[in-house]
């Protein structure tokens, strides 16, 4: 049969998962398409080392020659970083790429899908895709949203880029049943900026609270993602005045040039990079670094919870078996002296035979 599609998990990642050790998934689109060469390769290695330094196994995900791989070795990571022919693969592209033997970098959506398929519960990325500006006319919405609605994975991100429609994105996340929590923040971050004008319903204070939320979601049988919105520290974010000026100019230029639909977002990103003198690129890298650190902490908390005998998500061995009968309860098969036996004769009723004899002539 032509094509290959079985997911191959590296030995390191496979052993970590089997042992219940912490694992964090990493996307490869940032490496292949989000950063300039050769810095992209250095950042890819740095992010993996950042996870390892915290005691977590990194699992960078990509498709190599038609085979989805969870955990890349050094040659594969170098290939994703250096080869200009590496394509960008979202969920819809995976079956074709696998069938035809292509090599591609995975987006947030396809990374989340492949990670969840092999049992990875944590995923760190820079920012989520979302609803694009003007989506009311173009229907341009990232596949990240609908994919996360069906994947039981926790994604740590710095929100969504301010070039997107943040309000509409939050509405879609709510509609799709995706839990969103702010990590030590009550406002949704805007990727380049630590805060936006959009308030969040839920705030968590540490990695343990996120792990507890994951356990509660499992108990409820939920199969959608949890999005952990982790804002950049103020000193690592883009200058707010510069951000607002560049965004206003970029939107105006897009309108003047008749740029619409799917062409808007790449134009805005390119404009941000040019007009900020590359500062937006540094923000992007800082965001991913911070998110890998937080995702690693959550993965550690999740692994500890999974192994703990007091894990609220695990059954209590000292609790009574709900399937076993209660020894203090009355035997439902025994007659109840306080209730009439509907199947037996009523002793207070007259004997029909005696009544018949009394009326015999």
UniProtKB/Swiss-Prot annotation:
A GO cellular-component term linked to this record: cytoplasm
Keyword tags: Glycosidase, Hydrolase, Lyase, Manganese, Metal-binding
GO molecular-function terms, A-Z: hydrolase activity, acting on glycosyl bonds; metal ion binding; pseudouridylate synthase activity
One Pfam family this sequence matches: Indigoidine_A
Domain of life: Bacteria
Binding site for Mn(2+): 140
Cofactor(s), by name: Mn(2+)
Binding sites annotated in the UniProt record for substrate: 88, 108, 142-144
UniProt feature, compositional bias: Pro residues: 312-333
Keyword Ribonucleoprotein set for record: no
Catalytic activity entry: D-ribose 5-phosphate + uracil = psi-UMP + H2O
Cofactor binding note: Binds 1 Mn(2+) ion per subunit.
Composition-biased stretches (Low complexity): 334-354
EC number: 4.2.1.70
Similarity comment text for this entry: Belongs to the pseudouridine-5'-phosphate glycosidase family.
Function: Catalyzes the reversible cleavage of pseudouridine 5'-phosphate (PsiMP) to ribose 5-phosphate and uracil. Functions biologically in the cleavage direction, as part of a pseudouridine degradation pathway.
Full protein name: Pseudouridine-5'-phosphate glycosidase
Organism for this UniProt entry: Frankia alni (strain DSM 45986 / CECT 9034 / ACN14a)
């Amino acid at each position: 049969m032509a094509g290959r599609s079985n997911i191959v998990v590296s030995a390191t990642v496979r052993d970590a998962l089997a042992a219940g050790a912490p694992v964090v998934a990493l996307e490869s689109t940032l490496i292949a398409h989000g950063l300039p060469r050769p810095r992209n390769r250095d950042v890819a290695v740095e992010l993996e080392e950042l996870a390892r330094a915290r005691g977590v196994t990194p699992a960078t995900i990509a498709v190599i020659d038609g085979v989805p791989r969870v955990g890349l070795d050094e040659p594969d990571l170098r290939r994703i970083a250096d080869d200009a022919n590496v394509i960008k693969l979202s969920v819809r592209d995976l079956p074709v790429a696998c069938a035809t033997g292509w090599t591609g970098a995975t987006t947030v959506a396809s990374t989340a899908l492949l990670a969840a398929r092999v049992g990875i519960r944590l995923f760190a990325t820079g920012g989520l895709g979302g609803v694009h500006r003007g989506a009311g006319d173009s229907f341009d919405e990232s596949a990240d949203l609908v994919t996360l609605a069906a994947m039981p994975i926790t994604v740590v991100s710095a929100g969504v880029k301010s070039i997107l429609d943040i309000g509409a994105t939050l509405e879609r996340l709510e509609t799709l049943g995706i839990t969103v929590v702010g990590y030590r923040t009550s406002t949704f971050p805007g990727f380049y900026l630590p805060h936006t004008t959009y308030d969040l319903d839920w705030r968590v204070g540490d990695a343990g609270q996120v792990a507890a939320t994951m356990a509660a979601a499992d108990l409820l049988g939920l199969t959608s993602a949890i999005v952990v919105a982790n804002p950049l520290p103020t000193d690592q974010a883009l200058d707010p005045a510069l951000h607002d000026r560049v965004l206003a100019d970029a939107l105006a230029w897009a309108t003047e040039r008749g740029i619409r639909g799917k062409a808007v977002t790449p134009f805005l990103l390119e404009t941000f990079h040019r007009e900020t003198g590359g500062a937006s690129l540094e923000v992007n890298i800082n965001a991913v670094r911070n998110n890998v650190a937080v995702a690693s902490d959550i993965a550690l908390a999740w692994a500890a919870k999974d192994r703990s005998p007091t894990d609220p998500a695990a059954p209590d061995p000292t609790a009574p078996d709900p399937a076993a009968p209660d020894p203090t309860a009355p035997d439902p098969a025994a007659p109840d002296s306080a209730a009439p036996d509907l199947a037996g004769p009523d002793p207070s009723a007259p004997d029909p035979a005696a009544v018949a004899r009394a009326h015999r002539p």
